[in-house]
């Protein structure tokens, strides 16, 4: 798996983070973002594919889209910069309900529209298409693309705001040592979205302990 992403896709390896409970996270640079490959010591249970279907990566020197598949069956497409408005990375989603997708990503997450079926989050582009085979996502600890991460400056405020605007909670904010404070929300199809306040970007983290 690591050889595929490092050699065939060409992502630089950044660091290994122990996650506890037999999980290790191999982090790779991804055009200003991070690809997290989480390795489990124990076999993962079977889960249907969630809505995250294809990762698009803008790559200088690529003349036309190049479709690759990793050992777990995840699709990654290398594209020329600017192809279908992807300047860094893009994630293609399969959804059950287009209106619900627009309401969540446009109103609850407050992302900027980037086309009739797309939204922009920083340098990343999230696009979707209705797919009758799409199902509600199950557990996050399963093989395949399982979650995306949005970096923020105040995870508690952002998490509360998303819930107030109709988003569903995946897990409440918690602090991971001195590295990050994170939470999870879920979109209308149950896809997991990590909200992350990383200390290296935002400074010292708040404590879980409330006065």
What is the meaning of each model-derived region?
Residues 1-15, 27-115, 119-171, 175, ...:
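Glyoxalase I/VOC metalloenzyme domain signal
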Residues 20-27:
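Glycine/small-residue-rich interface belts in oligomeric ring/scaffold proteins
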């Amino acid at each position: 798996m690591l050889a595929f992403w490092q050699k065939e896709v060409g992502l630089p390896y950044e660091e290994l983070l122990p996650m506890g409970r037999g999980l290790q996270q191999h982090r790779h640079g991804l055009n200003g973002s991070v690809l997290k490959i989480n390795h489990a010591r124990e076999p993962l249970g079977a889960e249907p594919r969630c809505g995250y279907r294809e990762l698009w990566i803008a790559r200088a020197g690529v003349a036309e889209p190049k479709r690759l598949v990793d050992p777990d069956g995840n699709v990654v497409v290398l594209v020329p910069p600017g192809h279908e408005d992807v300047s860094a990375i893009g994630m293609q989603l399969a959804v059950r309900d287009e209106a619900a997708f627009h309401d969540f990503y446009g109103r609850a997450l407050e992302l900027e529209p980037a086309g009739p079926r797309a939204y922009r989050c920083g340098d990343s582009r999230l696009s979707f298409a209705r797919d009758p085979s799409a199902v509600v996502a199950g557990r996050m600890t399963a093989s395949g693309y399982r979650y995306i991460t949005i970096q923020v400056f105040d995870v508690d405020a952002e998490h509360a705001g998303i819930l107030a605007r109709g988003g569903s909670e995946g897990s409440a904010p918690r602090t991971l040592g001195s590295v990050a404070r994170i939470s999870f929300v879920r979109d209308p199809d149950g896809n997991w979205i990590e909200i992350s306040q990383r200390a290296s970007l935002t400074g010292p983290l708040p404590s879980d302990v409330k006065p």
